[in-house]
UniProtKB/Swiss-Prot annotation:
CDD domains: DEP_DEPDC5-like (cd04449). It is a peripheral membrane protein. GO terms for molecular function: GTPase activator activity. Residues 45-55, 639-652, 667-679, 868-885 have a biased composition (Polar residues). It comes from Coccidioides immitis (strain RS) (Valley fever fungus). This is Vacuolar membrane-associated protein IML1. Residues 1-55, 639-690, 724-777, 799-818, 833-943, 1426-1496, 1711-1730 are annotated as: Disordered.
Length: 1857
């Protein structure tokens, strides 16, 4: 029966079965599955009978209310069937039951169609995987009827309650299953017991979106939810109740099916519909070429009018949520002398040149069009592309005076000046010589730091390169090697889309110059494949003037591919390679439309059984030859040609007028008679129009001997007859005697055609023997080589035409040697391209198939296998090619010398090979060579057996070791290898014009992406599946070196890992759990689990990694590989033995070629908002330093004492969030009705408090802490985290209150659970106020301190949160914090304490309370002791009149030194040079272990590190950083989403931010730069700011260098994120729990979270869009499937969402209105009104509005001057109204007012505003007003000034939501 793979493809003309590769692959998979999936399983040995049996029954359909099971099978109702629990049963509709039924398309069986092949016939596929094609000869209506599919299920126990209610129920399926398979309720079905091996799926594709899944999660999902279960198309998978996936496609041996069994050997493929796409469009010179054969548009129109719209449409059809980045890139060439007055950019020091200095000067350009834009905004993307195309060529062709290196410099430097007017000084290079590798390398930087600042809603990064070329690129060898190393170490996929027609050679093809020194020492990256294809350039005598002018797009060899051949006077070596990490496609809108139209038409019947005839299409030639174009195609300018007999002395040529030479060369290939339809399946380098069937190729193409040879015309007629006439069968030629074979003239026929594969494209097909000048040969040769039916021991030989001088000597055989069998091939070579018409010349060449090796001058025998591996079939070269990887460069001999150019003979030397002897097992062994090389080793025999047929032209890539030669030299001498082995195994060396005949193994050509392809893809079609939903790197692979290669070519590092019994509970307790975690960690870092026969051969305890019981066995061996690193994990007793294999580095090469670890690359990049191109210096090098796997495994096992900084050393996954204070939603205030009297600041603090309670509730407590908790105390509420709330910035707090911070107990939030024994615990019913007051103020009581809040200093007070905790821990009958608050209010009612401002009752939070006078114990350390007792209960002003100001620097220094003196003896800093005076260390953040899986849905502990601020100013951002090593990101995302809902209720916006600062974004993302904004007018002199401490009345003065810049940012609703590291005192060691502060500039974030801003040292602004700010918005995630359309968004209501500015706000923040005494003419600089729905809908719009409004304000000199004056005036007014400062008011001025708390930001509004808007109760409002009146208003801070001006404050405007 014909396989579906044999008829796939839009251009298939004939009717062919599956290709040989497909059949071989399917047979391998089937055999592997049969061997692995036994029909008699150990757990159920009797469940699968030997022969299937059927049983008819009635099918029911149920819903979820009836049962949640998909299938119910009542075994008692089927007593005669013999079913048991565990059987695999197939459900199919009974014959005739579905006839005539009208089913919906989704209800019937799927008419499966391969994407990209629109003309593929669609067949209903059943569970067995084979199409129902036996009815082709029957009724057409029957063939077109849709039939229900077949469903598989495993019998489970029948629920007893269902049996009791429905005893007659036989089989029932769920509604969704019935709809998917077309089952009807009460219909008759057949039940068939199936063997698991018969129904096992080979591949299963699953899709997911809006999730970040690690590959370890995919592995766990597969083992938990898929293995040993039947699956079906459309099935929903739910893992851990959170991770969701859908089964997209199911394959059995490459065929799609609806249902199958997921065996342990099934390969899962995970595809993401929410990925990050980076589209590179190569703007080479061909992009502006016109399409001469199509519409006449330029090639760029194909991109903008057809390709991109089609891509966006397909994304919209699948509802994808991708982020798109588009970059235009090109390389501009400057190849002419530039005058000295030209731009400095044309200086040689600024441009790139070739390594030899002879190449033209070039400069690479990158223009970012869009960056991280949602795919739904395709109209914006296309508009941006069109606009950029208009100016791109102008911008890159006219160089600027010089390239700026910073964004600010780009704004200052004019593009053109009078001295340097614009001048076109360059032109784009061709696509061949473009900078494609550099672009790929730069784009891969997206994954270099993927563990830092992780986006938790997207998975995968795909690079798409659109090029106008044909897929051939000339690249530097070193960059190709470095890029291959980088890409193989990162899980990133690359798609290459070519706009030009596909050439007739292998693509994608990288052409590179080999290093001059081609030998290296052992340890080089020795490939497990054959040597790369290398050929030598001809000398200048063979110039391109003698070649056919193949200078148009679409030719067999493009002009770019032929440029420079023969141009160098000295010989240069070239290599060709096909990378495994590139997926190539070809886009032609005409073919796409034609294929779409053909897919809609009805297919016609074919005379051939089991095939389908395609609609006829016009013949479109792929090759355009100048000779054919110049003559009429229908003209008859042919002449007879005769081929002379071969001469034993020289190659005789005969000149004949033949204009058909080119025609013969273009169509002179015929399929092999023994190819069985495989040769006609088409390949990537031969057009489908050339495919044909031949009934008898011996009669029609290959005459048996010279007597039957006819003239060329008759031969062509026979050829035409063979093309246009179909024959059902081919005949093999008869075998003739050896004598006759030796006597007659043999012709060689072309190789067989194979279906190409994706990543190797056309390289998997058969060689193209039409030598269309691949190496500058001055003739075109047509050869037909007859394939002999010899034994496998006799490999085919490669021939080269002998020269005139050495032909006789070579042909003379040695005595006592067997007579060689020779063959002759015909060659038609064009003699010149002059005015006379070209003539066809016939020549012969000798093929020696059995000859003894002759000694060569280089000590080399032609038998050398390396020589055989590297020689080519083309006659263009006059010397043997260089050897393979194990061959040093031989000396040139007489035969190596180039032939005389005047002779122009097409002959070449005969390559004579040594006789191979046959081993006992039938393998071919090379004869030992004496004194040839100083290397040793043997070639694996299986390579010769597998690929002997293909070594005639160029051997295929081997799967074993590289070829080593025997040597009689020093056995200890290291082997030498080829330089191009550095590219292996990630770039396959290939002869592009004569690729191997036999397809190598899939693992050899697909590399790491082998298991992504269920079936062999096509090169000609666009890989839409990869472009729509890119696949994650497969979990498994099959590439593994042999045991001998691991020993010789790899460095081994063994170590053992054992479980720490004393470790915390979150680490695994068993060896199996530890092994799972070790495998998961490696999968998360890009490793793949190696499976297949190679692993079985090297491990005795190998078991399938998808088997749930496999990892628990002793001796289990797991191989994992990533690039050049292989890990072997072996379970040995109770330990795990890890052996790390690292490929030896390259040695022996020139330093400038390979030994350098990186290359400095300086492209010119222009980002979206950049004014000009800026130079970037990028290091194109290998991946970062090697991961410390020993420490990582020890960390997983619980050994963590030796790790000092696990976050950075072990590369934890890290993400950072901030809580931004925004306006409290009106709807949320109803939920906190008890806090109506609170101001907004207090509500924000309450929200943080609620979050900390949640963190404490889900906090992981280690066993050592858990054991100290009694059972009675475990039920009590967790204590909130100890966060110090301040109204100053952290740097000010550290400088002013260093003593207090050092005395703070860092473990208060981890206080002991019990302070008193159970016998001493208090009870509420027997306590007195006096006794309780003594306990509270005692040694173990509540902490009493003097605390400052804004402008007031409160003495001897305690915090409500701490008092609640104390009550909870010291009272036996108080178990919850609510009970403690209730008891505290009772105490407050009885007069034990009161609020410091008498505004609030007792609350659990950051509220200050004081003990009543009658119960107070005077503390000598308190400031309250300095005053009379009657004044102690009141808060005093912050600025006493009797104290003068002190110098800030001296005061800070004195305070710091005092702190050091007092604490130096207590601190022990290792390595300190001054142990007596060490730096005090202060941590501004703490961490705890948080359990993200409180419901225990995962099979492992899910614990992360949660870092939070220890010191927090309510006006600033509250920082949260998460880090984890082996947790599930989806559970982390779920925890974050629960925080979002809690924070929103209290006016806090949880926003994800980048971990690095905005100014350093270019270091990690080359295509992003901050946008600079400069002030049009310099601000006036900076005023002096002051601050006060809680322990001193002295007002400390500090200069605020960026006072006005901070005021501008606050004006535009920015809040402080992080301060610069220079803001902290230099004599204090400040750090966070995640590291030390490293920000160079202070950073602010907009309240929407959309924009980051920094202030540089020069006072400029740097703005950067935050691409994460909307990723965790519940609205965006809920409605993300609507592509952010504003009309479809209805987010939850927020305050001020729909409030216009002219309406009074019902919330705290009033609308900004001009006040008397201010200039109302100054317009507000607040950004335009932006609602919450707009912010969640379009981040670009929000970002642009903020940027534009801020830029407009900073560019308006009048507004700036008015703003500066207003700020100075307002600050002066607030300073002069201050009571204590009035004595020194004579010193005040508008620019230098009195020193006050300018550095203390505040959120609190004036009391009058607060009282009016909050509607406080009358007594409370009066008390607040009185307290405010008693307090002097010392306002010199930015907040105080902003509140007194008419400019919109952070509380005014629509942003406060």
């Amino acid at each position: 029966m014909l396989q579906s793979g044999g008829i796939k493809g839009p251009q298939r003309k004939q009717f062919q079965p599956a290709s040989a590769e497909a059949r071989s692959m399917r047979a391998t998979i089937a055999s592997l599955q049969d061997s692995k999936v036994d029909s008699a399983r150990p757990d159920s040995p009797q469940y699968s009978p030997k022969s299937p049996s059927k049983r008819s029954c009635t099918l029911w359909v149920h819903d979820e209310t009836f049962s949640r099971e998909e299938v119910l099978c009542n075994l008692q109702a089927l007593p005669d069937f013999g079913l048991n629990v565990g059987y695999l049963v197939e459900v199919s509709v009974a014959q005739g039951d579905h006839l005539g039924s009208q089913l919906k398309p989704e209800a019937g069986s799927r008419y499966l169609q391969d994407e990209g092949s629109f003309t593929s016939p669609r067949w209903p596929i059943g569970a067995g995987g084979s199409a129902s094609r036996s009815t082709f000869g029957g009724d057409a209506k029957l063939r077109s009827r849709k039939t229900p599919g077949k469903f598989l299920f495993i019998v489970k126990p029948f629920p007893p309650e269902v049996r009791a209610k429905h005893p007659n129920l036989q089989v029932s399926v769920a509604n969704h299953v019935a709809n998917a398979f077309g089952f009807k309720n009460r219909s008759q079905i057949h039940l068939t017991v199936r063997k698991r091996a018969q129904c096992s799926a080979s591949h299963v594709e699953l899709i997911f979106r809006d999730q970040f899944l690690l590959r370890s999660d995919m592995w766990r999902l597969t083992m938990s939810e898929l293995v040993d279960r039947p699956i079906y198309k459309g099935q929903k998978i739910l893992f851990m109740g959170s991770i969701k996936a859908t089964v997209k496609s199911v394959y059995i041996s490459g065929n799609k099916t609806l249902s199958a069994y997921f065996s342990p050997n099934t390969i899962p493929i995970f595809r993401s519909e929410s990925a990050r796409f980076v589209l590179f469009i190569q703007m080479s010179k061909e992009m502006w070429d016109f399409d001469s054969e199509g519409t006449g548009d330029i090639l760029f129109s194909r991109v903008i009018n057809s390709l991109m719209p089609e891509l966006f449409k397909r994304w919209a059809n699948i509802d994808a949520h991708h982020l798109v980045t588009i970059v235009l890139f090109t390389r501009v060439q400057y190849d002419f002398a530039t005058p000295t007055s030209g731009p400095a950019t044309l200086n040689s020091s600024f441009l790139n040149r070739g390594p030899d200095g002879s190449a033209p000067k070039t400069q690479d350009f990158y223009r970012v069009v869009v960056n991280d834009m949602p795919s739904g905004q395709w109209t914006t993307i296309l508009d941006s592309l069109k606009k950029e195309f208009r100016t791109f060529l102008r911008d890159v062709s006219i160089p600027p005076p010089y390239f700026p290196d910073t964004p600010i410099a780009a704004e200052d430097i004019p593009r053109f000046t009078e001295s340097h007017p614009p001048k076109i000084a360059g032109r784009p290079t061709s696509a061949l010589r473009g900078n494609i590798l550099e672009a790929i390398h730069v784009a891969s930087s997206y994954l270099a730091f993927e563990h830092i600042g992780r986006d938790l809603v997207r998975t995968g990064t795909s690079i798409v390169i659109i090029t106008p070329g044909t897929g051939v690129f000339e690249v530097p060898f070193k960059i190709l090697s470095l890029t291959s190393d980088v890409l193989t170490s990162r899980a990133i996929g690359i798609d290459l889309i070519c706009l030009s027609p596909m050439p007739l050679h292998s693509v994608p093809l990288f052409k590179y110059k080999l290093p001059r020194d081609t030998s290296c020492r052992p340890g080089s990256s020795i490939s497990s494949r054959l040597a790369p294809y290398e050929h030598r350039r001809m000398s200048a005598t063979f110039s391109t003037a003698h070649m056919s002018p193949l200078d148009r797009p679409g030719t067999a060899l493009s002009d770019q591919a032929l440029q420079g051949i023969g141009s160098s006077p000295q010989e240069e070596e070239w290599g060709y390679g096909i990378p495994h990490w590139v997926d190539i496609s070809y886009w032609d809108p005409k073919l796409d439309r034609a294929s779409r139209a053909a897919a809609k038409k009805k297919t016609t019947m074919s005379p051939v059984i089991a095939t389908i005839a395609k609609n006829s299409q016009l013949f479109v030639p792929k090759v355009r030859m100048y000779e054919i174009q110049m003559m009429g195609v229908m003209e008859s300018e042919q002449s007879n040609i005769s081929i002379p007999h071969m001469s034993s002395t020289s190659s005789r040529t005969q000149k004949r007028p033949g204009t058909l030479a080119s025609l013969a060369a273009s169509i002179g290939n015929s399929p092999s008679p023994d190819s069985s339809y495989r040769s006609q399946a088409g390949d990537g380098f031969r057009p489908k129009s050339f495919m044909y069937n031949i009934k008898d190729s011996k009669k029609s193409m290959l005459p048996p001997d010279a007597k039957e040879r006819t003239n060329l015309v008759e031969w062509m007629d026979s050829y035409d007859q063979s093309i246009f006439h179909l024959h059902p069968k081919q005949k093999r030629p008869r075998r003739r005697s050896k004598a006759k074979q030796a006597a007659e003239t043999e012709t060689s026929r072309p190789s067989q055609h194979e279906t190409p594969k994706l990543r190797s494209s056309m390289d998997l097909g058969q060689p193209d023997n039409r030598h269309l000048s691949p190496f500058g040969q001055p003739h075109l040769q047509l050869r037909y080589e007859r394939i002999e039916e010899e034994s496998l021991v006799t490999p085919r030989r490669i021939t080269q035409p002998p020269t005139q001088t050495n032909m006789k000597s070579i042909m003379k055989p040695k005595p006592k040697l067997p007579i060689p069998r020779i063959s002759r091939s015909i060659s038609f070579a064009l003699r010149g391209l002059g005015s006379a018409p070209p003539r066809a010349h016939a020549s012969t060449e000798v093929k020696t198939e059995h000859a003894q090796a002759l000694p060569t001058s280089g000590g080399r025998t032609p038998e050398d296998p390396a020589s055989e591996a590297s020689n080519t079939v083309t006659p263009r070269q006059n010397s043997p090619l260089n050897s393979g990887a194990a061959t040093p460069k031989p000396e040139r001999s007489e035969a190596d010398a180039p032939s005389n150019v005047e002779a122009m003979t097409p002959s070449k030397p005969i390559l004579i090979r040594a006789i191979r002897r046959t081993g006992e097992d039938g393998s071919v062994e090379p004869l030992p060579l004496e004194g040839s090389f100083s290397t040793q080793g043997t070639e694996p025999r299986h390579d010769l057996l597998q690929h002997h047929d293909s070594q005639g032209a160029f051997p295929v890539k081997r799967t074993g070791r590289r070829l080593d030669l025997l040597s009689s030299g020093d056995p200890t001498s290291p082997p030498t290898v080829s330089a191009t082995d550095a590219l292996s195994p990630w770039v396959s060396p290939i002869n592009p014009w004569n690729p191997p005949k036999l397809a190598p193994s899939r693992s050899s050509w697909y590399g790491r992406w082998q298991h992504v392809y269920p079936r062999i893809p096509k090169t000609t079609s666009v890989k839409w599946k990869s472009l729509k939903s890119p696949a994650s790197l497969p979990i498994t692979a099959e590439e593994l070196p042999t045991e001998s290669e691991l020993t010789s070519n790899f460095l081994q590092t063994p170590y053992r890992v054992y479980q720490n019994d004393e470790a915390d509970a979150e680490v695994p307790k068993t060896r199996e759990m530890l092994l799972r975690d070790m495998i998961s960690l490696r999968l998360s870092h890009g490793f793949q689990i190696v499976v297949g026969k190679k692993v079985e051969e090297q491990s005795t305890g190998y078991s399938n990694i998808f088997d749930t019981n496999a990892l628990s066995k002793d001796g289990t061996t797991v191989f994992m590989a990533r690039g050049n690193v292989i890990h072997r994990l072996v379970c040995v007793e109770g330990e795990i033995e890890v052996t790390k294999f690292t490929r030896r580095p390259l040695n022996g090469f020139p330093t400038d070629e390979l030994n350098d670890a990186s290359i400095s690359y300086s492209p010119a990049v222009k980002t979206i908002l950049s004014a000009q191109y800026c130079k970037n210096t990028i290091s194109l090098g290998a991946p970062p330093e090697e991961y410390n796997w020993n420490s990582a495994d020890a960390f997983l096992a619980g050994h963590r004492d030796h790790i000092t900084n696990s976050i950075r050393q072990l590369r934890f996954w890290r993400t950072r969030f901030v809580l931004i204070p925004v306006q409290v939603p009106l709807a949320a205030r109803r939920h906190i009705s008890s806090f109506h009297e609170d101001n907004e600041e207090e509500i924000h603090l309450l929200g943080i408090y609620k979050l900390t309670q949640m963190w404490q509730r889900h906090r992981y407590i280690p066993p050592e802490e858990r054991q100290f908790q009694s059972a009675a105390r475990k039920s009590k509420d967790q204590n909130p985290l100890n966060i110090i709330y301040q109204t100053s910035d952290p740097s000010v707090v550290v400088a002013a209150e260093l003593d207090r911070l050092l005395l703070e107990d860092p473990g208060l939030d981890n206080a002991p659970a019990q302070l008193l024994p159970d016998s001493e615990l208090l009870q509420r019913y027997n306590i007195t106020l006096a006794f309780l007051a003594q306990k509270i103020q005692g040694e173990k009581g509540v902490r009493m301190m003097d605390r400052r809040w804004h402008w007031r200093l409160h003495y001897n007070c305690f915090v409500g949160m701490e008092f609640t905790t104390w009550l909870l821990q010291n009272f036996r009958d108080i178990d919850t914090r609510e009970e403690a608050v209730e008891f505290g209010n009772d105490l407050m009612t009885h007069g034990l304490f009161h609020h410091v401002q008498r505004r609030h009752n007792f609350r659990d939070g950051n509220y200050f309370y004081q003990i009543a006078d009658e119960y107070r114990v005077v503390r000598p350390e308190s400031r309250g002791g300095w005053f009379q007792p009657r004044k102690v209960d009141k808060s005093n002003p912050n600025t006493p009149m009797g104290e003068a100001m002190k110098d800030s620097a001296s005061s800070i220094r004195a305070r710091a030194e005092k702190s050091i003196d007092e604490t130096g003896s207590k601190l022990d800093i290792p390595g300190s040079s001054k142990p007596s005076r060490p730096k005090p260390s202060i941590s501004l953040a703490k961490s705890l272990k948080y359990d993200v899986d409180p419901r225990k849905r995962s099979d492992r502990p899910e614990v992360i590190d949660l870092h939070y601020d220890r010191i927090h100013n309510p006006e600033n951002c509250f920082h949260i950083e998460l880090s984890w090593m082996n947790a599930t990101p989806k559970l982390v995302e779920d925890a974050i989403m629960s925080w979002v809902g809690t924070a929103e209720k209290y006016g806090l916006k949880l926003v994800e931010l980048p971990i690095s600062e905005a100014s350093s974004i270019v270091e990690r993302q080359v295509f992003r730069r901050p946008y600079p904004i400069k002030l049009k007018v310099d601000p006036p002199p900076t005023p002096v700011s002051t601050y006060l401490t809680a322990t001193s009345f002295t007002s400390q003065a500090v200069p605020d260098h960026h006072f006005y810049q901070k005021a501008i940012l606050k004006k535009f609703d920015f809040v402080l994120d992080f301060e610069a590291k220079s803001a902290f005192p230099a004599n204090v060691d400040v750090c966070y729990s995640w590291g030390k502060p490293d920000y160079q500039f202070p950073q602010y974030v907009h309240r929407t979270g959309a924009v980051l801003a920094q202030i540089t040292d020069e006072g400029h602004f740097l703005l950067l869009a935050n691409r994460f700010h909307n990723s965790h918005n519940p609205v965006s995630l809920k409605d993300s499937n609507k592509f952010d359309r504003s009309s479809e968004y209805f987010p939850r209501p927020r305050a001020a969402t729909f409030d216009p500015l002219d309406r009074r706000s019902p919330l705290l923040s009033p609308v900004a209105r001009p006040t008397p005494g201010t200039d109302s003419s100054i317009p507000s600089a607040s950004p335009p009104y932006i609602s919450a729905s707009d912010a969640s809908q379009n981040s670009y719009r929000v970002t642009d509005q903020i940027k534009d409004s801020m830029r407009a304000f900073c560019s308006d000199a009048e507004q700036l001057e008015a703003f500066f004056a207003e700020m100075a005036m307002a600050k002066g007014k607030t300073a002069t109204t201050a009571g204590p400062a009035s004595l020194s008011s004579v010193k005040l001025s508008p620019t230098t007012p009195a020193t006050v708390d300018s550095s203390i930001p505040s959120l609190e509004l004036p009391a009058s505003v607060v009282a009016r808007n909050l509607h406080l109760p009358q007594p409370v409002a009066l008390a607040a007003a009185q307290a405010s009146a008693e307090t002097p208003q010392v306002a010199g801070s930015i907040d105080a000034v902003m509140r007194s001006t008419s400019v919109s404050s952070p509380r005014n405007g629509a942003f406060r939501h």
